[in-house]
Amino acid sequence: MSGHSKWHTIKHKKGAADAKRGKIFTRIIKELTVAARAGGGDIDTNPRLRTIVAEAKSVNMPADNIKRAIQRGTGELPGVSYEEITYEGYGPGGAALIIETLTDNKNRTVGEMRHLLGKYGGNRAAENSVAWMFDKKGYIVVDKAKTDEDALMSAALDAGADDLRDDGDSWEIVSTPDAFQKVLEAVKGLGIEPGAAEIAMLPQNYVKLEGKPAQQMVKLMDILEDHEDSKKVWSNADIEEKEIEASLA
């Protein structure tokens, strides 16, 4: 299982508790507002908004919450204005980090991110010093038990996917960001609900971490993801599943 897939799978198990605490709802509401402000409130003409609305529904966000968040983005309702800011850095063991945030106070967020990186053995890096190590891709994960390989491959490739990768118990479907929505709709058209579906920053190469650096990295990524301004955290760290689970316990 790839480093990205391992982290996502284990965090997904932990995600039920996060949802109860409202953390997932808070992030999605911010994303809905920003997407609507950037591209309008119509999901038929705003693919980014359509993807986030689908995610909101997948975690059972009430329709009224979704509607109000979109209306705050379009200006139909008053609300806080959020800014998208991406930070780059290094964690323990030299693993690279990309931290995507949505914030209403840039100075507060940059200070807190710098503090967290330093506290857990990392440091902030200059802009574009880390981003080049990653490729921005559409990323969909499908449980092998839920699908026929030939049918999935045919549907995904016909919809514009670049690759179908064998990842142990699952298939990873990779596409360009522009093709992502069409590929996702093709997968769902087979009656499959993906285990993950997102625009992801996928590492070109991984950095293997073990022992203390691995434990520190897991704790750092976990606390960064739990930060109220955090949207997504990406890393090229490759850590064994048992070490991730033990560090998150």
Language-model-detected regions and their locations in the chain:
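Positively charged, low-complexity, intrinsically disordered RNA-binding extensions
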Residues: 139-249
